[in-house]
Amino acid sequence: LKVKGKKNIAFAELPSVTENGMSSLFGCAEVEDVAQTRYSNLKTVIPDVEIIQLERLNSGVTANKLVLMFGDIDQVGEKKQLAGLKDINAYEAFVSEKINDLFSMGYGKVYLTADHGFVITGILDEADKIPVPDGDIIKSEERFCLANDTLGNENIIVRSQKYKESQYQYYAKSDKPFVSKGAYGYAHGGFTPQECIIPSYEFANENQESLGVFIVNKSALLNVTGTYFTVKPVSYTHLTLPT
């Protein structure tokens, strides 16, 4: 197996949070909080796409177009904060293994991206956190605030862009979080390059000259009679012949 990779980048939607980034990746016109709604939207654009969790990938998957979801890195970061960093190498190895599995199954190209990145804020004292700006603040999160008016504050970045019910977004100029509830250490939603620059990687199998066929029900062929078969080309390699 000889794999060639192209490392490109893209910009995440802002705020760099899951529901916003995923809605964009799945082609939604508006921000959709429910994952199944996002999946349904993609299927209206690409009817033959199959969307499954990465850990469910196996040789029985025969979708022509396949989207694999893997959210463990984000979930571990949210739960364990800094302690979750030690798990990332294992997750990277797992994803790499699954990419090789896809090529072994006959897929010619694999694209890897993410809904957002993250920033490591470290363990902070309360004095290190940024006060929430004064004004008509609709929602305040660790890495951004939403409002319906402009604020004259030189210490924050103001973005005039509608997001859900708000008209303005406010971001810290550093990796420090706004004062908010919850644990600190791992965060996303903000404006730093670590949060809003995402991978757009392409991997291709250079050894794939022709697609192989893996027949899983060979015993059923013993009951098939006749001289000629009509073969239709398929774009996947795992083929189950009818019984």
Regions found by a protein language model. Give the residues of each.
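Short secondary-structure boundary/capping segments
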Residues: 2, 80-86, 120-137
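Flexible loop/turn segments at secondary-structure boundaries
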Residues: 1, 74-78, 118-121, 207-208
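Active-site nucleophile/metal-coordination loop of metallo-enzymes that catalyze phosphate/sulfate
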Residues: 2-60, 160, 165-166, 176
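A long, amphipathic alpha-helix that forms part
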Residues: 78-110
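Active-site neighborhoods of enzymes that stabilize oxyanions during catalysis
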Residues: 127-129, 134-232
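Metal-dependent active-site segment of extracytoplasmic phospho-/sulfohydrolases and closely related
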Residues: 99-128
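Conserved small/polar residues in nucleotide/adenosyl-binding loops
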Residues: 237-242
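Short loop/turn segments at strand-loop or loop-helix junctions that form parts
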Residues: 67-75
